[in-house]
Amino acid sequence: MGDVIVLYAAPGMGHIVSMVELGKLIVHRYGPHKFSITILYTCGSVVDITSISAYIRRISHSHPSISFRQFPRVTNKITRNISGAAIMFDFIRQNDPHVRRALQEISKSVAVRAFIIDLFCTSALPIGKEFNIPTYYFYTSGAAALAAFLYFPKIDEQTTESFQDLRDTVFEFPGWKSPLKAIHMVEPVLDRNDPAYSDMIYFCSQLPKSNGIIVNTFEELESSNVLQAIAGGLCVPDGPTPPVYYVGPLIDEEKELSNDAAAAEEEDCLSWLDKQPSRSVLFLCFGSRGSFPAVQLKEIANGLEASGQRFLWVVKKPPVEEKTKQVHGVDDFDLKGVLPEGFLERTADRGMVVKSWAPQVVVLKKESVGGFVTHCGWNSVLEAVVAGVPMIAWPLYAEQHMNRNVLVTDMEIAIGVEQRDEEDGFVSGEEVERRVRELMESEGGRVLRERCKKIGEMALAALGETGSSTRNFVNFVSSIT
């Protein structure tokens, strides 16, 4: 039995999946004789523990060298009217005693070679240092977003107003080709008076104080200007930038265990795709939590119908509050009731609508899939990149507006939809039709598809024996041994 590397995941399926993929990479490259992996995760009011527990059971069964340690349940004590992000950040801080206890207990029986934390788990950084454990960040988005976060303490100095009030004022980030509107900043920093704002400033200011930053991307995907800005210290002008290791793309390609009903629907979906012409189907899916109110679902349906294109569309139950863009769980609902009357019947010969979930990694790799409408969550972006599928970028929350900017302007692997710059981010049916036709019918769409195919090949090469991500990963391991 080798030494252990402890990973600490932020709440949320996307964060845990990314951490697990990093753990799988370490075990795959070096085996349990050198390193075992222990993943710490939280339990409480902000966590969808049911779906996470099912996922963890699957990973524990298939990867016995990866163990999980669930913290005792924590309940938020905050009752003030603050944002969901502020509530989550407070929830994570309340787990600090559990982090300290876990590291203390693990260290008694085995050497902890490294402690790797999510950005949102920054309050654990001094705990790792307290135990003299080399402490690294695992940044689960791309290099451009990392550049922005590293630079954000300097942006904070440029204004005393809330970004949500500055709206169309633009801000420049080192290495970025185009500036970002204030209203499109990452959600937790929009309101300067919300506690989440100061939390984010703190998180970003602590990034350079780590032993290094591991990033789930690969060099060939990112703009050379962004990579140079980070490496050259432009993002942290007042101090040293720690080593940055680009080790991706890390994605979960294992088949999920489904119940009988889900398995049957999955089989129908994949069988339908197999019958469609090459690169003819547009896949629409907005992540594990992305959801739309009924009025927006109807606009999407109208746009798809008017476009005349083949499509596979994953529809989630509309949120209770119209302006909310996230749902938790997969509650049943009346599909016909949230779509235009007769839509399913009129498009039955060229479209398929499934409720709540589809095997996204498998779908994107199908020969018939020629485009992907995505919320720009980084895991989904990487899955499309690896599959060589171009995207229509439709951001909903978190850092997704940042990702949209970069995908469209810097990486040139996506087309952006025009959204209303209000809280609901509304997109008209006419805009849906326009962008779908642009991607699936135009010469520009064909060029984009060819470019994405080449980048997909680069993604695989990056993970090869002599690839850039493999080289960077070896450098990371060398830093802890």
UniProtKB/Swiss-Prot annotation:
UniProt keyword Transferase present: yes
One Pfam family recorded for the sequence: UDPGT
Cited PANTHER family: GLYCOSYLTRANSFERASE
Gene: UGT88F4
Organism: Malus domestica
Enzyme class of the recorded protein, top EC level: transferase
Function statement: Glycosyltransferase that may possess chalcone and dihydrochalcone 2'-O-glucosyltransferase activity.
Residues annotated to bind UDP-alpha-D-glucose: 288, 357-358, 375-383, 397-400
Official protein name in the record: UDP-glycosyltransferase 88F4
Family, per entry: Belongs to the UDP-glycosyltransferase family.
Coiled-coil annotated spans: none
EC number: 2.4.1.-
Gene3D superfamilies assigned to the protein according to its UniProt record, in alphabetical order: Glycogen Phosphorylase B
Keyword list, A-Z: Glycosyltransferase, Transferase
CDD domains: GT1_Gtf-like
GO molecular function: UDP-glucosyltransferase activity
